[in-house]
């Protein structure tokens, strides 16, 4: 099966659109679908001197491996014009709309996984939308009780005992009960993953 990955472009004034376009310039053994502002992507495409062909994504189309210099896009326009490196709280809602749509696509099995470009937590909160990170946002949208973040680097996999917390709050948040919950989620998750780069480890260190 060829997986279809939905990629959020993140904060439009940041590096997110650039990362997505640079990714789309190469070939990949999966189908890529971007969620973001088509106008911003087109402007960054030109400014970076790339030649990525942007086209609207059609729901339900057959899955095919990504061809270099192409990018299907689900357009979510910005509220205000975007200037690179200049944050605008009026556009913060568009960032969260990307995540909401990407989550819906995965839950509907239209897409098989989500990749997220960087966001700016500060500007989202300044806009009056409480946001501590992707992990908590996705946990809330999917009614997930105990989300666990997993970092991978080759054969090494590191699960974090907390999500996004101030450092001062970390010690009191780690308890025998919370560790047991996280370890159970980790063990169950690793057993259910079929991709070769995330096979069940032969040892577990705590």
Language model feature labels by segment:
Residues 73, 147-149, 158:
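Conserved beta-strand scaffold positions in the cores of enzyme catalytic domains, especially
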């Amino acid at each position: 099966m060829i997986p279809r990955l939905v990629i959020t472009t993140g904060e439009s004034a940041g590096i997110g659109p650039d990362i997505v376009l640079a990714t789309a310039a190469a070939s990949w053994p999966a189908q890529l679908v971007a969620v973001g502002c088509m106008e911003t992507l087109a402007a960054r495409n030109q400014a970076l001197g790339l030649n990525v062909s942007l086209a609207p994504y059609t729901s339900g189309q057959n899955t095919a491996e990504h061809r270099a210099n192409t990018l299907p896009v689900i357009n979510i326009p910005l509220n205000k014009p975007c200037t690179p490196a200049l944050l605008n709280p009026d556009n913060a809602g568009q960032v969260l709309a990307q995540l909401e749509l990407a989550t819906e696509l995965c839950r509907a099995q239209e897409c098989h996984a989500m990749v997220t470009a960087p966001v700016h937590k500060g500007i989202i909160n300044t806009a009056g939308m409480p946001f501590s990170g992707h992990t908590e946002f996705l946990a809330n949208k999917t009614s997930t009780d105990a989300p666990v973040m997993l970092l991978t680097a080759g054969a090494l996999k590191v699960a974090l005992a907390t999500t996004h917390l101030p450092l001062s709050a970390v010690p009191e948040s780690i308890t025998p009960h919370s560790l047991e919950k996280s370890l159970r989620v980790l063990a169950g998750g690793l057993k259910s993953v079929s991709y070769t780069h995330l096979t069940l480890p032969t040892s577990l260190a705590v």
